[in-house]
């Protein structure tokens, strides 16, 4: 009888629906707040409270490419970025972005990709970050790995972006530009992971997470 009593709870557990046992399926399904491929969003640097930004202003030194900055305003249309994969087939619209996945961030208004390379940044002498390419097509220096702690990049998470080609982290340390982009902050790459390179998804149009890219809705 004692062994029968021990077996009864195990048999009951086996008969329960999986929906009543959420811990057994943890990590298989994306949470409703997962950031997805194709979503358009703004990214807030959590240390300096500025949003990742670009515009049709080129650097006067270094690469001479389109500049990338941080702005305090939350309503600036030049702060929207589209989430894309290393290729369009690797990150279909509506697919949740996994921690450790390489993505591209394409500036919506100019069609250029977030980019870095071995040029010094103009103010802090870290690594220059620019916007590069045409109509969303650039080169292999446009790839960034999303670093987060779970299975998927969640909207509530503070995440890091580590550059695939040069291994720097997308960062802000507070330096401000003068004319013609007075008050905007320098965005650059830093070799070390620290509190200057945490980012959080903010305003935007998010595609509802789905493991089946054919089934999605905009939120």
Feature names for model-found ranges:
Residues 2-219:
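Lectin-like carbohydrate-binding module/patch detector with strong preference for beta-trefoil
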């Amino acid at each position: 009888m004692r062994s029968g009593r021990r077996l009864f709870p195990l048999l009951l557990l086996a008969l329960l629906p999986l929906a009543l046992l959420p811990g057994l399926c943890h990590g298989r399904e994306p949470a409703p707040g997962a950031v997805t491929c194709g979503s358009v969003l703004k990214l807030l640097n959590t240390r300096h409270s500025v949003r990742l930004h670009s515009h049709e202003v080129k650097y006067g030194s270094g690469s001479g490419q389109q500049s990338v900055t941080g702005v305090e305003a939350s309503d600036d249309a030049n702060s929207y970025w589209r989430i894309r994969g290393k290729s369009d087939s690797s990150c279909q619209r509506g697919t949740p972005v996994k921690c450790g996945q390489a993505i591209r961030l394409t500036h919506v208004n100019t069609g250029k990709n977030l980019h870095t390379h071995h040029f010094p940044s103009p103010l802090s002498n870290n690594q220059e970050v620019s916007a590069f390419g045409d109509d969303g097509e650039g080169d292999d220096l446009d790839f960034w790995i999303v670093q987060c702690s779970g299975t998927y990049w969640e909207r509530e998470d503070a995440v890091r972006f580590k550059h695939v080609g040069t291994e720097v982290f997308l960062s802000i340390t507070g330096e401000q530009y003068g004319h013609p982009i007075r008050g905007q902050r320098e965005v650059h790459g830093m070799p070390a992971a620290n509190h200057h390179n945490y980012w959080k998804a903010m305003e935007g149009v998010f595609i509802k997470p789905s493991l089946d890219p054919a089934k999605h809705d905009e939120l």
